[in-house]
């Protein structure tokens, strides 16, 4: 597993002390038994703690995690029995309290449909605490090899104070097409949809992704694929639901505004020619049909 961070200085801003980094875990293979992966490697956690305490000048620095998105795709054939249980674990707690309430989902790799799992981890930890972990348990899948591939996307920010958010239950988005045929089968397309999820499913006041992260690049509208079979992620509160079409409209190339006049001028000749042809067709059609006049208009009404 690899965490892509360009610079440790990007982990915090000196002006407000808040910055969000979106990281990516690549080639996360789920095998038989239980697979656990930390959301923050120990070597990076030490550097974050040292830098945050120096920059934010606090003995206890809050490490605020945000939404976590998992992309799960099966590597076993369709019809394979068994399922997996995906849980969000807080290792700073003891026993059954390690499982974060409401952050547990199940999935069947043999269903032939990949899925996206969105976890709400708006929790606060000190920078020197043990980070959250993802636990994937194999329940009855008859294989000792890899049965699924997982890619995790998550964000966090550093702050000198704790912030409290309302946690939402975890939700799963199933894709209606096969894994190898879906539009979200490669990393770039999954990343684009995850970016859409981050931008539209956050609650008011939550930290947003910063442009310094390489995962926060939104492609041009010509490069954005059509997401088939995916329900748009829900938004909390009374906000209006956002659709992928609305998301695409936000990133229309600005050059389209400058080219609007030239497009109108180039199409004026063709439009006028079409209108002339249409008028000629209507005139020819009406010319062949005899005109029926109203009796009152011709004066044929008899007088009494």
Swiss-Prot record:
GO terms for biological process: symbiont-mediated suppression of host innate immune response; transport of virus in host, cell to cell. Residues 264-277 have a biased composition (Low complexity). InterPro entries: MPV. Keywords: Host-virus interaction, Inhibition of host innate immune response by virus, Suppressor of RNA silencing, Transport, Viral immunoevasion, Viral movement protein. Pfam families: 3A. The keyword Membrane does not apply. The keyword Transport applies. Residues 278-295 have a biased composition (Basic residues). Residues 257-304 are annotated as: Disordered. Cell-to-cell movement and long-distance transport of the viral infection. Also acts as a suppressor of RNA-mediated gene silencing, also known as post-transcriptional gene silencing (PTGS), a mechanism of plant viral defense that limits the accumulation of viral RNAs. This is Movement protein. It comes from Carnation ringspot virus (isolate Lommel) (CRSV).
